């Protein structure tokens, strides 16, 4: 019996559902019931009927699923899978900011630990961060933990005083302006789609900026060639 058959058999026996992030291997995505970005999978986690949620992703995703559906058992296939950025803010920093600003809302990116979420006022994803921040009554916004997404949001809501944390995604910041310029020279007619976790030096060249699912939709709906700059292989795929 193949591994795939074993997984499907156990899934049925245990009354489990498998959620997989776009970032996991293709083989894992093929046995998953739902594949998507953090926002989509968070919504799915609140609606599934199965007793067990198997979350193929990093730790904060499993934590989020448990927070949203506390009566379900949530299992992580790889307990060591983690997002470094999720730990790049502290409760001490949040408490310090609350002392400095009376009219403050702490906006926590979903890519963060459960502890950080408990000290925040609202949790957002890259899909809805701008909309939520824009509609908050607070003038001062402490955006954690990703400074690049926070900076992107700040530009969309100039009426807010967005205070940035120093966190970042190691993978996204590994994509540099030089890499973009070099690739654009090679493929001058191509479009560039980028995630807002990239640096502003990269985002200024982007034809589209959005969440993982947004980028996929953009690729599907666009007829022109698209640049995909990959790290660490650093090559362009058309």
Identify the meaning behind each predicted range.
Residues 33-41, 71-81, 122-129, 160-169, ...:
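Short hydrophobic/aromatic-enriched beta-strand-loop microsegments
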Residues 87-96, 115, 121-136, 143-149, ...:
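Active-site glycine-rich loop that binds ribose-phosphate moieties when present
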Residues 168-208, 212-226:
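Redox- and metal-dependent alpha/beta enzyme cores, enriched for Fe-S-associated oxidoreductases
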Residues 15-24, 28-30:
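N-terminal glycine-rich anion-binding loops that anchor highly charged ligand groups
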Residues 227-238:
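Single conserved hydrophobic/aromatic residue that forms the stacking wall/gate
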